[in-house]
């Protein structure tokens, strides 16, 4: 199992939002590069970065920060937030980012997403955010009519091999993981699923690994000290 500690960026700072609400933001650090180095020191091989400014308004406000983190080396980095064009994908891949995550655009322009998956292969992933089982879009403000699990099946059929699946109701709440959901997702043969949202105990991570979840993203639980990254990596990372 791959463990992705998360760095969410807003205005160059390391922050966490509560359930995607920009008005419920906590700042955890002023130096994202130092946070990334701390993760490496704890044994991290992977890093999940979200550009919250990009997600909100499509800007590249955190581009230089992400470039600096990538330049340090030592990590497989995936980036999401505001990636809606092939030009943006290329910009990130040219920086040394390993994988780009498509979000709302994957729902709104499925043909584009399929084309990018064909063009860039495993360097493209899709972030599927769901509430009450249905796909949410536009910063989690709207629910679509499609079940998240069904959308994941469509993505796999279109050539997308990796999905980062976030249960919004659990995100930033440290309420624990919706294990039944990830059991259902694990039954989609050939799809690599990354669990995201509310992961807050080592027991959950062991359970996720046991049911075949490919990776997990750790956010708030790391920053509050509820989970120790070194301990987690030693226990569950392949």
PLM feature spans:
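Glycine-rich phosphate-binding active-site loops on the catalytic face of alpha/beta enzymes
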Residues: 83, 94-112, 167, 197-201, ...
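Conserved, mostly hydrophobic/aromatic
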Residues: 8, 39, 47, 92, ...
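Charged helix-capping and loop-helix junction motifs
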Residues: 60-67, 141-150, 175-183
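Glycine-rich, proline-tolerant flexible connector loops at the mouths of alpha/beta enzymes
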Residues: 46-64, 104, 109, 165-175
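Catalytic cores of alpha/beta
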Residues: 73, 77-99, 180-215
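Conserved beta-strand positions in the central sheet of alpha/beta enzyme cores
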Residues: 48-51, 78, 101-102, 125, ...
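Short, acidic/polar
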Residues: 28-40, 84-90, 144-154, 205
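Conserved anion-binding
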Residues: 15, 19-23, 90-93, 97-171
